[in-house]
A protein has these predicted regions:
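Rossmann-like adenosine-cofactor binding region
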Residues: 50-51, 221-309
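Long, intrinsically disordered low-complexity tandem-repeat segments
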Residues: 113-148
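NAD(P)-binding Rossmann-fold cofactor-contacting core
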Residues: 11, 210-226
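Phosphate/diphosphate ligand-binding glycine-rich loop within oxidoreductases
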Residues: 41-110, 170
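Oxidoreductase and adenylate-handling cofactor-binding alpha/beta cores
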Residues: 97-110, 210-213, 335-344
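Rossmann-like dinucleotide-binding domain for NAD(H)/NADP(H)
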Residues: 267-269, 273-417
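N-terminal glycine-/charge-rich "phosphate-binding" loop or analogous flexible N-terminal tail
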Residues: 1-39
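Phosphate-binding beta-alpha-beta segment of Rossmann-like dinucleotide-binding domains, i.e.
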Residues: 83-116, 155, 166-195, 199, ...
Length: 417
């Protein structure tokens, strides 16, 4: 019988894993060499450093991480010892895509993408400034999807005429105040740069394209067509979705450094849902203070769980590394982990790990009324399923509970299709 040591915070796994062998469940960050000495399999998450210190002298034949990321695994050591490993590519990609899209909806409602000259067209259907409601003119929202009437359908031919697709450089105020900004609460026509186009970046690109965004894909190792220079020149928002790497021409450690932000010409919102160390915390704070960006959306942090208090205060959305924490993504990761074990040992075992159903009338935290009147119903429906401001409020109230908030994350679902 197989002996498995399993991170006790991996959801939906206990009953299913018992079909594979004898299971021991332990806190991921507390798993020791003694714990795994007699184990055949280690199933973990990113909080367990899988290396020589942990595995030397053990019987472990297979390491599985129930995550997309795998920089916590010393793969060179595992290869040296002939220990196999698997991750769960794409398991929570749609969850991260949901996080990015919903964060951009909130940024749009806050006025982060608005300029006075960009919020009206020639027939003077314009948005009011400050915290006032939209103008009462019934043309303020279009009848088909509740989008802002100032927009036109998104096509390659007319993208350049959309409110968010103008290519001129706009001077930023160092003290952007969303309460005094004109706004256009739509994602249609935004140009969004995605850095890192693996499973997650691809899912983000797809969900934003469905909202009418123009997407610039930047991933030099994959031969994607756009560069960081292109994104700096054209993107209204930039979202990081790379692994963390330290060597080579395309190393991603501090990819978003001071020079990255200095080169931005029109970017309003910066998002890090990759790894914390892909962005230099001091550089992000500088960019906010100097008006190089208007808002930061930070899900991954340097030095987790001991995160920057100043960036926590300054970010528009600040969450404890939970962008991929939908129940759907977790269920996918658990299923893929168990299937990897079964395949490795030649076991005839298949796993169906359904995500829990939502209760009737489910709402993932209420939106402020100052935002709800700025958003179309389609956006509000998405935000009822997941509102990242709720996670932000929770983290700001108790940043010392970073790990507990991850380990005891509330029920969240992706779109129910």
């Amino acid at each position: 019988m197989l002996r498995l040591v399993i991170d006790d915070k991996i959801p939906f796994i206990r009953e299913a894993a018992a079909r594979l062998g004898e299971c021991v469940f332990l806190p991921g960050a507390a798993i020791t060499a003694d714990d795994v000495r007699e184990a055949d399999v280690l199933i973990t998450r990113t909080r367990t450093q899988v290396n020589r210190a942990l595995l030397e002298g053990s019987k472990v034949q297979l390491v599985v991480t129930a995550t997309i990321g795998h920089d916590h695994i010393d793969k060179a050591y595992l290869a040296e010892k002939g220990i196999a490993w698997h991750n769960c590519p794409g398991c929570n990609a749609r969850s991260v895509a949901q996080y990015v899209r919903n964060s951009l909806w909130i940024a749009a409602a806050k006025g982060c993408f608005a300029e006075g000259e960009r919020c009206f067209n020639t027939d003077e259907r314009r948005f009011e400034a400050n915290e006032r409601d939209f103008a009462t003119d019934e043309r303020a929202f279009s009848t088909n999807e509740g989008e802002c009437a100032a927009n036109v359908p998104t096509t390659d031919k007319n993208l350049g005429n959309l409110p968010h697709s103008m290519t001129h450089n706009v001077a930023f105020s160092k003290a952007f105040d969303p309460t005094n900004a004109p706004f256009c609460a739509t994602l249609r026509g935004l140009t969004v740069g995605i850095v890192g186009v693996g499973h997650v970046g691809t899912a983000v690109a797809e969900i934003l394209a469905a909202e009418g965004c123009r997407v610039l894909r930047c991933d030099p190792p994959k031969g994607e067509p756009h560069t960081l220079v292109d994104l700096a020149r054209e993107a209204d928002a930039i979202s990081l979705h790379t692994p963390l790497t330290f060597e080579g021409e395309h190393a991603t450690f501090h990819l978003a450094d001071r020079s990255f932000f200095e080169n931005l010409q029109r970017c309003r919102v910066f998002i890090n849902a990759a790894r914390g160390e892909c962005a230099d915390t001091a550089a992000v704070e500088w960019a906010l203070s100097e008006g190089k960006i208007r808002a930061a959306v930070i899900d991954t942090w340097e030095n987790e769980p001991h995160i920057s208090a100043s960036l926590l205060r300054a970010a528009l959305i600040a969450t404890p590394h939970v962008a991929g924490y939908s129940a759907d993504g977790k269920a996918n990761g658990t299923r893929m982990s168990l299937e990897a074990v079964a395949r490795h040992f030649g076991l005839d075992a298949h796993f169906d790990i359904p995500a829990p159903a939502l209760p009737a009338g489910f709402v993932y935290g209420a939106l402020p009324t100052t935002l709800t009147h700025r958003l179309p119903e389609r956006a509000l429906a998405q935000l009822r399923l997941y509102n990242p401001l709720t996670d932000t409020d929770r983290l700001r109230a108790a940043p010392e509970d970073f790990e507990q908030q991850r380990g005891n994350y509330p029920l969240r679902r992706e779109e129910i299709r």
